[in-house]
């Protein structure tokens, strides 16, 4: 599990992208060939969790801006919302190197992404959305409480305040 020996920060030239290999070859290819260019072009912010002692990238995720139509938001979350598109952050891509699978790093990366979006003060974001790959949809639904959008059930949505409230109640329960 992630601890003080691991570091998370923006992707840079110094990170060993060539050694990264996750279970999904599309994600591996994206990280090796396109992530740095996307970061430099400001298409997406790419955050990497790495072990500086081993010169290994453990995992990464991308964040970019997006919007969701009001009508797509689950009705139970629409009270007091404006009737126009809502600003959200897209958790676009995420991967964990095969050597680190099954150790809780995927969950740690999602929590880090949610906390990063919640704490930032540069732009407003009401929620996070994700388009999960086949086989990981339940991870977002069950572990974090994401819900399907009304008009696109393949795209999942999590109100940031819901995440913070859940995190606070989990902390109090410990």
Where are these regions (language model features)?
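Conserved active-site alpha-helix within GNAT-family acetyltransferase domains
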Residues: 118, 123-125, 130-151
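Short glycine/proline-centered loop/turn elements that form peptide/ligand docking sites
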Residues: 110, 134-136, 153-160
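Conserved acyl-donor/pantetheine-binding loop and adjacent beta-alpha core of acyl/acetyltransferases
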Residues: 60-93
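Conserved acetyl-CoA-binding loop-helix of GNAT-fold acetyltransferases
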Residues: 102-115
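A short, internal acetyl-CoA/4′-phosphopantetheine-binding micro-motif in the GNAT/acyltransferase core
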Residues: 92-102
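Conserved beta-hairpin
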Residues: 42-65, 72
């Amino acid at each position: 599990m992630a601890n003080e020996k691991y570091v998370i920060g923006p992707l840079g030239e110094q990170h060993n992208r060539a050694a990264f290999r996750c279970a999904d070859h599309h994600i591996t290819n994206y990280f090796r060939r396109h992530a740095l260019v996307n970061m430099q072009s400001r298409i997406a912010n790419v955050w990497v969790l790495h072990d500086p002692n081993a010169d290994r990238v453990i995992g990464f995720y991308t964040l970019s801006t997006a919007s969701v139509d009001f009508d797509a938001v689950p009705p139970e979350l629409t009270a007091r919302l404006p009737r126009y598109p809502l600003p959200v952050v897209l958790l676009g891509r995420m991967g964990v190197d095969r050597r680190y699978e099954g150790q809780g790093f995927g969950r740690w990366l999602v929590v880090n992404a949610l906390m990063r979006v919640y704490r930032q003060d540069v732009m407003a974001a009401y929620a996070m959305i994700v388009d999960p790959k086949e086989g990981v949809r339940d991870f977002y639904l069950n572990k974090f409480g994401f819900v399907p959008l009304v008009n696109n059930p393949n795209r999942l949505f999590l109100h940031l305040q819901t995440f913070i409230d859940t995190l606070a109640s989990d902390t109090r329960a410990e």
